[in-house]
Amino acid sequence: METHSSGRGLAAALACCALITLVLLANHPAGGGHSLTEVISAEARDRTADALVHGGFVITLTALIVCLVSVARTLGIARPIVLTGLVSFCVGSGMLMLSMILDGLAVPAIATRFIGITDPSALLPARTALMLCGVLIGILMPFGLLLQAATMLSWSIAIAARRGLPLAAAIYGILATALIAGGLLLAPAAMSGHLLLGAIVLLALWYGALALLVGTRAIAHR
């Protein structure tokens, strides 16, 4: 009875993480501006919203790591394919957390320090700092999502031999991984923003699928 209750609790936690991820994504500040002063103004204006959304992502990713450790134990954490997926998710989440901190806290803080300044020479440090943050975010976020997609792939392979819901979830995981990897690695740079958002949505749906599998006890280790 205790095991069943803990399974339902884990399923509820995964479902909440999936839902919160989608809600945070829907409320992500749009930013805006073309010139440096416009970008600084927009980032400073949205500082509170940025902190809430990106801070929420960091907390959610932390909760997901805890949840996926429990799922890995259910799948059989000693299995190489399961352990590899867990490590990949943890590393990917760490990269995403750093990206979120830069995007949601560092960039708005930098912008706030330079709000109202119009002298190009005085804005040079802001341009340099914002460019550095942008480069780091552009590296950390795609790689973090790819590592999380690798977890989805490895765990999908781990449950692909089963019938019913596990097989359906495995097929989804494999297809979603192909879409994420293909999009992030092959698509034009101009589409990168939309592809990153799409990857987060696909991963959130996978968390929901894991919640269903755990809640129905369809992936207990055999």
Question: PLM ranges: what are they?
Answer:
Residues M1-R222:
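Hydrophobic, aromatic-enriched alpha-helical segments typical of multi-pass transmembrane helices
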